[in-house]
Regions:
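Short, acidic, small-residue-rich periplasmic hinge/interaction motif at the N-terminus
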Residues: 3, 30-32, 36, 87-128, ...
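Extracytoplasmic beta-strand/coil segments of soluble accessory domains associated
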Residues: 87-89, 136, 140-177, 207-208
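Short acidic/polar hinge/loop motifs at secondary-structure boundaries
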Residues: 178-207
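C-terminal beta-signal and adjacent terminal beta-strands/loops
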Residues: 181, 646, 706-707, 711, ...
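Transmembrane beta-barrel wall of Gram-negative outer-membrane proteins
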Residues: 261, 267-408, 501, 561
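Face-selective signature of the C-terminal outer-membrane beta-barrel domain
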Residues: 391-405, 431-597, 603, 612, ...
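Gram-negative outer-membrane beta-barrel transporters
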Residues: 549-556, 563-565, 688-709, 714, ...
């Protein structure tokens, strides 16, 4: 799957560690590195006599470390059964021997700063260092990337530069898609993908449209995760390995019993000081309490309840690699921080002759008090991974994998958090996601025209959502939850050819296919009238991507993608005698008159000779162009990029059910993203010290998405009978800047990153239910309202490596701005149910320390939210505060 820089995947395959080896003779540096890496190394000291090395600073795998130390020396290492041996490079020359240190083996972190596009990479160490409480916390600090509804689910809903949901930002796990759409009441929907962070080996993030088999429909970008493999587990020089990892964290406790109330309670209108006591009784009696006292029994900082444990084993038997892993995770209900916009009770008294009328309310970011247990933030999950890779003769290999994720978690409808007087702990929701992949690769060493990759994958997700409190009434409590089943199948084929003619050329071409099916686990007739969805969708895509390097300093890229899709709703579309329009004008009004659907053709109930179903077919062709220029060949690169992508209507958007439905006479069109970007990359060494590394990335982007698909109100002339309608609106525009600065001198390192949005606009032209054609804060009842990113967000990380790199200590500061505010008057979103969730600006401090006793044993300690801030995450659908100060202790052992 080619959705990132060439070579990044190979560089990401092996685990890395931090090293701080000072300058010395080449023999001593090699010996020191081998000792710290825990591998055997043999060489003839006389062969290296007189050669020096500037040492090794930073994070490297064993192969990368040897490559960096020996780069330009005319020597290389050869892997043998009992370790490594130094030998002369076959093509070494005298001039090469005179230069000791030059650019070494590419690391995935370095590829970010060589790519003529906005990309990011999260290594295994990054994921471990900033694990957080929720899965989405691993993306905190990544420029341009946020996670929607991070505290009210067990899944990932990634937002890249304002694009989110419905496969705008697909999350790929070993190349497979598993995204599902979950009903969130009047507040809309949430797209979710599920994976355990202990089983992730690395994450590559591409921002904006990309070519390749993995980029179909990705108008926002692609998040490509790879699961752990044998190289992550097996130490160098061995043919088997076992990794055991365990961690425990505080600031949490067992979930309370279902029905337990939380947050500010008993608000409303009451009577006091009544001349007639009975008037102050019943529903008008002044409440004795406004909170659940047991919810404030917060554990001490080092009093753990939550835990995560995993074990992974790998075996290498000649040409066969096998991996098996199991992970178990328990997250209790966490406690909110104490410092910030916590709620405070408000009292308004109106005195009358015989009584006082008292109105009790609250002011604050959410209903939860500072330091309170946040109900429904609990989860329990377990995951299993089986993986095998077989290296065949003639440079071929086959890889099979199976991943299963099961979670039981608490959550609440955002509408309950917003509107009801009491919020309560509910019974757990459940999800089981299974992913199977099979991949084949042929890369013959004697042919540069063939690098063939093909694969098939299948995902199966079963979910049960139990997220209604008893405030909604006994009838809802007794109703069985609807069990939803979601299945996806995909296949892809691609080949890369390289040749030389007026420069270097790389041609990548191929195609992909996927089919999706959604349905309810109910009998056939009953399922047709349930609120869930039932339908199928399939999509085919062909692409070609050409890269030409006419001179060392120039690189040109051009690509083209064609795709077509069909979505079909299994539910009947209209009832008897429904009138449908025969012709619709450009403004959405009916111009051709209406005809009545004959009774014998369709009906929601009873027999039907010719039922009417919603069926949408779409297609499109989109180009990508880019050019990069490295004028002085010193690591400074300038680039410009124009990238387009089509996203065909999703299965959710093409079918009837809860939240919204398409209309028979309102055709859905594909979204069309047109993104332009100019930027600069810098990757150099020896800036302030002989062995330091400086990397920087700067980008300005202008993203324009035409025919944006979202939920709206029906127009007044549309006799749809629907409360909410799925349709294309005019456009969404997002513009801004993004910057990253990364400096590593070995003993000290720092990383700064930030994103600034200077223009956000969503337009609906021609609709009857609007005040303004365009706004910067949202549209009435649109899902986009809670996908608008903050005006800015940034992070600063500073760390040091001590005791020869064994101790790594540091801190990260996260700064989050506000989103665009809704106006006090003439608010377009006030008439809808999806009113933008406003969060306050906040600053967080996280600290971490890691000590590696040996290559086989390490200990990590983190404190997240050191200053115990009370805050609401951006892009929240419901008012759920984030965790307060949380300590975490982890241990990793490798055998």
């Amino acid at each position: 799957m080619d959705v990132r820089a060439q070579g990044m995947a190979a560089a990401a395959a092996a685990p890395s560690h931090s090293y701080a080896i000072p300058a010395d003779s080449l023999s001593n540096v090699l010996a020191e590195f081998a000792a710290r890496a825990g591998v055997a190394l043999s060489f003839d000291p006389a062969m290296l006599d007189g050669l020096r090395s500037s040492g090794l600073q930073g994070e490297f795998s064993v192969a990368q470390g040897f490559g960096r130390i020996l780069a330009g020396t005319g020597f290389e290492v050869e892997r043998r059964a009992n370790g490594y041996a130094v030998k002369r490079s076959p093509q070494a020359s005298v001039s090469e021997l005179e230069t000791v240190i030059v650019q070494g083996e590419h690391r995935p972190q370095d590829e970010v700063y060589r790519t003529a596009a906005s990309v990011s990479y999260l290594s295994r160490d990054d994921i471990e260092r900033f694990r957080g409480t929720s899965i989405g916390d691993i993306f905190q600090g990544t420029p341009g990337v946020l996670v929607g509804e991070n505290r009210n689910s067990g899944g990932l809903d990634v937002n890249i530069r304002g694009m989110q949901g419905q496969s705008r930002v697909p999350v790929l796990v070993d190349g497979a898609r598993q995204e599902t759409t979950v009903y969130r009441g009047y507040s809309g929907v949430s797209s979710r993908s599920y994976v355990d962070p202990d089983l992730i080996g690395g994450i590559e993030i591409s921002k904006g449209p990309v070519n390749g088999v993995g980029g179909v429909g990705a108008t926002g970008g692609v998040v490509a995760m790879r699961t752990i493999n044998a190289d992550d587990i097996i130490r160098d020089g061995k043919d088997w390995g076992i990794r055991v990892r365990g961690s425990t964290s505080g600031n949490s406790s067992a979930a309370p019993a279902p029905g337990t109330a939380g947050g500010v309670q008993n608000t409303g209108k009451f009577h006091d000081n009544c001349a007639v006591p009975s008037v102050c009784g019943g529903q008008f009696a002044m409440p004795d309490s406004h909170r659940t006292e047991s919810a404030f029994d917060r554990p001490a900082l080092l009093d753990p309840y939550s835990y995560a444990a995993s074990i992974a084993g790998a075996w290498r038997i000649e040409s066969l690699d096998l991996v098996a892993a199991y992970s178990k995770r328990r997250q209790g209900t966490y406690y909110a921080g104490k410092h910030g916009p916590t709620p405070e009770l408000t009292y308004a008294k109106e005195s009358e002759p015989f009584l006082d009328k008292v109105t009790i309310g609250y002011q604050g970011a959410t209903r939860f008090y500072g330091g309170e247990q946040v109900i429904n933030s609990n989860s329990n999950s377990d995951s299993q991974l089986l993986k095998g890779k077989l290296r065949l003769p003639a440079d071929q290999q086959v890889e099979l994998s199976y991943l299963r994720y099961h979670s039981e978690y608490g959550e609440l409808m955002p509408s309950q958090l917003l509107w009801f007087d009491k919020i309560r702990q509910t019974s757990n929701s459940e999800v089981t996601a299974q992913t199977a992949t099979a991949r084949y690769e042929w890369d013959p060493a004697d042919s540069s025209l063939i690098h063939l990759k093909t694969g098939v994958w299948y995902t199966h997700t079963d979910s049960v959502n139990r997220n209604y409190s008893d405030e909604l009434g006994q009838a809802v409590q007794e109703k069985d939850p609807e069990k939803e089943r979601y299945k996806r199948f995909g296949a892809d084929l691609s080949n890369e050819s390289q040749f030389t003619f007026l420069g270097e050329h790389r041609l990548n071409y191929g195609g992909s296919y996927q089919r999706e099916d959604i349905g309810l686990v109910k009998p056939g007739v009953e399922a047709l009238y349930a609120s869930g969805r039932s339908g199928y969708r399939h999509e085919t895509s062909l692409f070609v991507d050409w890269n030409w390097q006419p001179a060392p300093e120039w690189n040109l890229n051009a690509g083209l993608r064609y795709q077509r899709a069909r979505g079909h709703d299994n539910k009947r579309m209209v009832a008897r005698h429904t009138e449908i329009c025969t012709s619709v004008g450009a403004d959405g009004r009916c111009e051709g008159g209406k005809v009545s659907v004959p009774p014998e053709q369709c009906g929601w109930t009873g027999p039907c000779d010719h039922p009417q179903y919603y069926d949408v077919r779409t297609s499109g062709t989109s180009p990508i162009f880019s050019v990069s220029w490295e004028p002085w060949m010193n690591g400074l690169q300038f680039y410009a990029r124009h990238a387009e992508a089509y996203r065909m209507p999703s299965l959710f958007e093409s079918t009837r059910g809860w939240s919204a439905a398409p209309l028979q006479d309102v055709a859905l069109k594909p979204e069309h993203a047109i993104n332009r970007e100019v930027g600069m990359n810098l990757l150099t060494e020896g800036v302030l010290a002989s062995n330091d590394r400086l990397a920087a990335k700067l980008a300005y982007f202008r993203n324009h998405t035409k025919n944006y698909l979202t939920r709206t109100f029906p127009n007044t002339w549309e006799d749809s009978g629907e409360d909410f309608v799925m349709r294309n609106v005019e456009s969404v525009k997002v513009r801004g800047m993004e910057a990253t600065l990364d400096y590593d001198a070995g003993w000290v390192y720092t990383r700064l990153s930030g994103t600034r949005y200077n223009f956000v606009e969503v337009c609906q032209i021609g609709g009857s239910n609007r005040i303004h054609e365009c706004t910067d804060y949202g549209l009435a009842t649109s899902y986009f309202n809670d996908m608008i990113p903050p005006k800015w967000h940034a992070s600063l990380q500073l760390g040091t490596r001590l005791f020869e790199g064994k101790l790594d200590v540091g801190a990260r500061v996260t700064l989050m701005g506000k989103r665009n505010q809704v106006p006090r008057f003439n608010n377009d979103t006030a008439r809808g149910f999806v009113q933008p969730v406003q969060w306050h600006a906040y600053q967080l401090v996280d600290v971490y320390a890691s000590y590696r006793f040996s290559d086989a044993f390490s200990v990590d300690f983190n404190i997240d939210n050191l200053t115990d801030q009370y805050y609401l995450d951006p892009l929240s659908l419901g008012l759920v505060p984030a965790p307060g100060r949380t300590a975490r202790l982890g241990v990793t052992m490798n055998f």
